[in-house]
């Protein structure tokens, strides 16, 4: 299991590429927001909905 953490202003291409490659390799991936909400906005306005909130 891999946890990929997201914060406001993340680099969209870098984050999405990592998640995509891991999932293609059949590795279980969870996207985790370290913000107060599961919806996190990247550096260029793209929004990602995380699977989990970091508490």
Predicted regions and their residues:
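Extended, subdomain-level signal for the structured scaffold at the beginning of enzyme domains
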Residues: 1-55
């Amino acid at each position: 299991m891999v946890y990929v953490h997201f914060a406001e202003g993340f680099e969209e291409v870098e984050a999405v590429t990592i998640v995509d490659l891991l999932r293609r390799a059949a590795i279980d991936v969870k996207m985790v927001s370290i913000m107060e909400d599961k919806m996190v906005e990247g550096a260029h306005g793209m929004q990602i909905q995380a699977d989990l909130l970091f508490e």
